Amino acid sequence: MKKAVCIMSGGMDSTLCAVMAKRAGYDVVALHFDYNQRTMKREKRAFDEICERLGVVKKINLDVSFIAQIGGNALTDTSMQIRKDGVSNDVPNTYVPFRNGVFISIAAALAEKEGAQAIYIGVVEEDSSGYPDCKESFIKSINEAINLGTSADFSCEIITPLVNLSKADIVSKSLELNSPIELTWSCYESEDEACGLCDSCRLRLNGFKKANAVDKIPYKK
């Protein structure tokens, strides 16, 4: 059976990717990262619950807390305020420098070890916070680098099925494919109730609104 490493944060985008990988006939190896982000425990809980729901047998949780040591972002540095003034065209302070590059590189090492043919990652370029490492051009370039820098008998494809979708499209697709969107967590700041104001919450809520769907996770009143 063909195999895919799925980078899973516990959010709705990466969860949908895992569902799509399974539907495409891949045996999913679920990969989650702890980097001392504010909602680390809540994201890990979501990851575990989602894997159980999807019947994922092999799941790996890696400590990459060196990302927090590098710093420079509001997700790992609690002295910085997470911006809550709405989504803008500027790169927000929640951007973790080259995070996806780090994650994909580690996923590639795991894929080579596992003999996986694909890496799934839920990057979204069209309707997102404008993170530079979510661009389709970046993904294509790092995919080329991976295949140049790994064994001659290994080759894998980075699959980004959501990259050109809107958040509304992602919500609709999740509901269509019975992705467990109600188990996912998107908030950058809170672990008990989503704040509803950070970029990630705003994008999520707007996606549900445009899809005429109800988000079942708890939000602060």
From Swiss-Prot:
Transmembrane segments: none annotated. The keyword Membrane does not apply. Catalyzes the ATP-dependent conversion of 7-carboxy-7-deazaguanine (CDG) to 7-cyano-7-deazaguanine (preQ(0)). Belongs to the QueC family. This is 7-cyano-7-deazaguanine synthase. It comes from the Bacteria. It catalyses: 7-carboxy-7-deazaguanine + NH4(+) + ATP = 7-cyano-7-deazaguanine + ADP + phosphate + H2O + H(+). One of its GO terms (biological process) is queuosine biosynthetic process. ATP binds at residues 8-18. It is an enzyme of class 6 (ligase). GO terms for molecular function: ATP binding; ligase activity, forming carbon-nitrogen bonds; zinc ion binding. Keywords: ATP-binding, Ligase, Metal-binding, Nucleotide-binding, Queuosine biosynthesis, Zinc. The gene is queC. InterPro entries: QueC (IPR018317), Rossmann-like_a/b/a_fold (IPR014729). Disulfide bonds: none annotated. Pathway: Purine metabolism; 7-cyano-7-deazaguanine biosynthesis. Signal peptide: none annotated. Binds 1 zinc ion per subunit. Zn(2+) binds at residues 187, 195, 198, 201. Its EC number is 6.3.4.20. Its cofactor is Zn(2+). HAMAP family: QueC (MF_01633).
